[in-house]
Amino acid sequence: MTKETEFEFVRLVGTERRKADTLAGVSRRWQGENERFLFISPHDDDVVLGGGLLIQLAQRENIPVHVIVVSDGSMGYCTEEQKENISEIRRQETYESFKALGVPAENIIWMGFPDSILSDSCGRKAAQSDDPKSIEGFVGLQNSFTKYIRQIAPTQCFLPTSSDLHPDHKVVHQEFLISLFHAAGNIWPELGSPIENVPYVHEMAVYCDFPEPPNLRMKTPESLLEKKLEAIAAFKSQQQIGSLIDIVRKSGPYEYLRALNFKLYQPAAYYDMFEKKHHIPFIR
């Protein structure tokens, strides 16, 4: 097998099947040297499970990769001994994991919100003076997301699917999407200058299936799959990690993405629906 055929990208656009051996070849409005990818990980291992191949593919095309880890991992202990220091254990495992995928430590952002209760951190509110999550005097998922979206100015973003059963994943999905629009507007100027363009957003399946079928398939050499498995295995404190490794290995060197499209409300789009020409007159 040649090097070219080891990498395959297939994007479905309506009835059209677009195929290439690079991400650029199948991507929408590729921005060349300006491309920057941002991965949103509700918990430290989510992005590795859902996008460990994609991260390596981005490195192959010299695309900077940034990762936001939203929660502090404090509820991820599997033994009594881990209970007091699991957050620090998982932080070190995260650095080891992303190092295996080629992501530099300085590109990993820790938001530090309490694990398993991210719903308590929705929105934005005035921060207590001693809150380490405070940014410009405020705290909350939308506050932090808006800050980092403006700081990084990504061209494409990747996060777990909205259909995941984990409440933290659902909250992150919702809060991140509205933060994209905050980041593009003039609201909260202390968090930085607005981004010029809202980035493209893609869903990754981590535990649950996509709400609708994905439209991008990525195939890599087995060597990239082995690197992904190595990165997953770095989370040694998570005793269930072995079963996840088995699932990923059996699935082979493939990952899938589903593009999200935002359709803003336009009242004029419904005008013709209510015109007489579309209906039979009602007779009493």
Question: Where do the PLM segments sit?
Answer:
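Active-site beta-strand->loop->alpha-helix modules in alpha/beta enzyme cores, enriched
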Residues: 1-189, 274-283
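A conserved mid-domain beta-alpha-beta active-site/ligand-binding segment of alpha/beta enzyme cores
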Residues: 203-260
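Sparse recognition of residues in long alpha-helices and their boundaries
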Residues: 110, 192, 243-244
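A generic secondary-structure signal marking the coil-to-beta-strand transition
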Residues: 35-36, 107, 199-200, 216, ...
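Short, active-site-adjacent segments that bind or coordinate small-molecule cofactors and metal centers
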Residues: 242-284
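A short beta-turn/loop motif at secondary-structure boundaries
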Residues: 164, 193-195, 249
